[in-house]
Amino acid sequence: MTITPGAVTTAPPAPALSSDALTGKRRVAFAAYVDENYLPGFLALLRSLALSNPGVCEDFVVLHDDLRPGSIARIRALHPRIVLRRVNTEHYDSYKKGDQDNYLVRKAYFILDVFRLREYDTIITLDTDMVVLGDLGELLRLREGLAAVPQFFYGQHKLNSGLLVIQREYLSDAFCAKLDATGRSGDYELDKHDQGILNAVLDGDFVRLDARYNFVKRRLSGDLPVPDDTAILHFTGRHKPWQGGEAGYGQAEDRWREFELSDADFQAAYLARSGTLHHDLLVHLGTPHVARTGDTESARKVAAAHITAGDYQDAVDILSSVRIPLDEAWPHEVLGHALMSVSRHEEAKAQLLLAAAAPNRAATAYARLAQMAWVRGDDAESLRYATAGISVDPTHRSSRLWAQRAGTVPPQELGSAEDQLAHVAFYMDRQGNAGDKLLPETVRLGFGSDTTSRRWHSVHAHRLFDEAALERVNARRGLVIGGGGLFIPDTMPNGNSAWQWNVPDEHLRGIDVPIMVYAVGFNAFDGQSYRAGRFRESLRLLVEKSAFFGLRNHGSIAKVRAMLPDHLHDKVRFQPCPTTVSRQLVAGWQDPAKRDDTVLLNAAYDRAGLRFGHDYGHFLAEIAKAVRGIGAHTEVQCVAHSLDDERIAFDLRREHGISLPMIPMYDFDNDAIRELYARTRLVIGMRGHAGMIPFGVGTPIISLISHPKMAYFLADIERPEWGVSVHDRNLGAVLTERAIGILDAHAATVADVHERQQTLWKVTEANAADLRVILGA
């Protein structure tokens, strides 16, 4: 039976914004003006950027007006994120100075088109006669103003051409209007030594950068060596290295020629770099390199990058394309990992057993073998492999986890099958994520007060849903699917569904009891996507089969509807996460008579690169300011939903000398989690359930937004001001002001939380009535 959603008043849908707009994540790009004459210089610049900063890969905007298709192809071969933009010469037709046929003048004009870009928050311009020799991290972390290196010869009030670090306030119509007005007035000087119009508008008002970020060739006259700390070497002057160079600058030009490489040599040089290699560059340059050379180690690196991004089949394909020697354990392990992630278990087992022969890869290989056996339901084999991993490395955390899972005796089912509901969820391990630990029980409370095995038959989402599992589910009254953001591609990958429930289509089709999807979330991070058609096919079948399909926020609803045909859109409805209405669901709940005078702080570190981008240092410094400000008013304590969350306390102490108590919530049972959050006065949390759980027990919240789902929830309760982006330029001040405002008006804010909660409870009650009809209760 399928129930059509009734006319229940729900919170307004979340705005249809991009993920980075919701999280406030800074969009960073490089930019340059390129023409055919300077193309050799630009190609060397691209190579130097990748080789000197192998972990950096932002969009590179190429401004041009005459590049040939073959030239564009050569550029694209070197960088995976090229954005081509034609300059608009009409902007400059009315300018009163400048020889339009002079390249240096045209370049000075056309680079002004950078200020007309609106897609980015920070743009770093580079000249085509530059090479990058050092780390650009400082430039990528800049957050304010327009930064440049002052001119070396012609006065510190002017900026030198080539390098600019431009922030959002300058990428505006208002600033462009100033540039155009100055250009039309003719009140500027334009020659090969300066930026002319820009210098006239700024009049010295720019952030000064160290000369090493735009180290001009002229400082090396007399064949001086390039200083070791030079980050960007700029070949100013008429004579460029690719045109034959200039006498007296031999050592500088030798540095440029380090990047005069063929595509094949460039790819090999990048793959040979140590340290962190950026996923996009590694895949872009490594794929043709592996195809040409068949190099096993390069194939392993590219495959590992694919796995990190959730592109498991791509990882299988590239490692399967090369011959892996029997004694090279690491590639066998990575291939085994990729194969198990697409549910090709027998092939994966063979690869992992080969990897287990090497002592340095054995523990990880055994842990993966234990995981596969557990997924297939073979606890004895899983325990055997996990024990082997521990014997190789007694400290190996993953092996210990699988030993614990495989050795745990499942609770005895007390009720009869016909009285039970089957429940697919992610059942968290001891010391696992506190929010995920609480979720399955809270979902069950949405169907009644008895959450025990008398009423419920547990189905772990990550174990293969085989014929035996299908038979057990069909013996129950119905199937509930819910307990977190199950729509995420990489937490426990499988090739059967490409989301967290490991269910083949044929077994999903075989379910003949009502299927109720309850408060599931679409959990892809900003910068993460579902690339597999397999997920869409499984999702469509699930929606078709479901009698009830409820998602926990309107943002998830929009994302899922976009993947479905129109006729299925109306089946997707709003069902708030039950943790947000815990006060209504927990039998005998009583609000605390007195609260502790504390503020609890939570930060999350899973997928830290997607959460923070280049801004972690900024985030930590701003949190330190907020902790000092709030701490002068109320005691601040850290709360860890998982072990990784404890990093915030370590980093604050090491970097800023702040010591905070750490509460290990991952060790708490469900009642203790709710009780702690109910007793505190305010929770500042980055995890989704560090917002939803305290809200559900009536505690005010401020969300540190690093994931779209935080903004989705705040939009649903019509309180976007209860969130602040981890990227906010003034995070510390904003957080302090809002926190103290909530603490000073605490009773009123708690009343507001209760009122917001009532809106979600009405939706939950209306859905519960529909669910009772579905279940014939």
Where are the language model's segments positioned?
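Short coil turns that delineate tetratricopeptide repeat
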Residues: 293-294, 326-327, 360, 394
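Active-site anion-handling motifs in enzyme catalytic cores
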Residues: 233, 404-777
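A glycosyltransferase accessory/donor-loop signature
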Residues: 1-45, 55-56, 62-63, 70, ...
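Conserved donor-nucleotide/metal-binding helix-loop-beta segment in metal-dependent transferases, i.e.
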Residues: 132-159
